[in-house]
Regions:
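Short helix-capping and hinge/turn segments at secondary-structure transitions, especially at repeat
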Residues: 1, 15, 32-36, 75, ...
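ALDH superfamily catalytic-core signature
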Residues: 1-65, 116
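Residue-level signal for secondary-structure boundary elements
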Residues: 4, 8, 35, 71, ...
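Short, well-ordered beta-strand elements within core beta-sheets of diverse protein domains
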Residues: 12-15, 65-74, 89-95
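C-terminal core of ALDH-fold dehydrogenases
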Residues: 26, 76, 81-167
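Active-site pocket-lining segment
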Residues: 59-74, 78-85
Length: 168
């Protein structure tokens, strides 16, 4: 875990039910002592009651801390619904070898940046080549995503003519 207080940190991890029994113990071991895991009931069945139970509030919280909420989902549809309900619309990602599922995720998730098999930490104005990041917008009007100076300016068009007209 690195830089948990930044806006592109991961707060919630959705794990497909098909891989939970193999993946969750490996994840818990890798993150032991590095962060607090808050688990849904299915994840707690696998990892044990020593971990705190995740609450409804956890799914919508940006912790800015070393906390990771984990929820087990039954397939892409359930993951998409969770994201639709709780996403900040900043950055969302999917880790999968299934390209069709990944493309579907990238198409259907409403976020300023969507990722397939890449770190969400790339959502950054400097990384995207915009220069120093001045902000990040999750709105759909005007700029969306990391913004540099260019995204914050508006344009004024000066049009000079010699009597030209526009035909219908």
């Amino acid at each position: 875990m690195q830089r948990c207080s930044v806006c592109n940190a991961v707060e919630t991890l959705l794990v497909d039910t098909q891989i939970t029994s193999r993946f969750l113990p490996l994840l818990a071991e890798a993150l032991a002592g590095q962060c607090e895991l808050r688990l849904d009931p299915t994840a707690r069945e696998i990892l044990g009651d020593d971990y705190p139970a995740a609450t409804e509030e956890d799914w919508a919280t940006e912790y800015n801390d070393t906390i990771l909420a984990i929820r087990v989902v039954d397939g892409l549809e359930e993951a998409l619904e969770h994201i639709r309900l709780y996403s900040t619309q900043h950055s969302e990602g999917i880790v999968t070898e299934d390209r069709e599922e990944a493309e579907r995720f990238l198409q259907l998730v409403d976020a300023a940046a969507v990722y397939h098999n890449a770190s969400l930490r790339f959502t950054d104005g400097g990384v995207f080549g915009f220069g120093g990041e001045l902000g990040i917008s999750t709105q759909k009007l005007h700029a969306r995503g990391p913004m540099g100076v260019e995204a914050l300016v508006s344009y004024k068009y000066r049009v000079y003519g010699d009597g030209q007209i526009r035909s219908s």
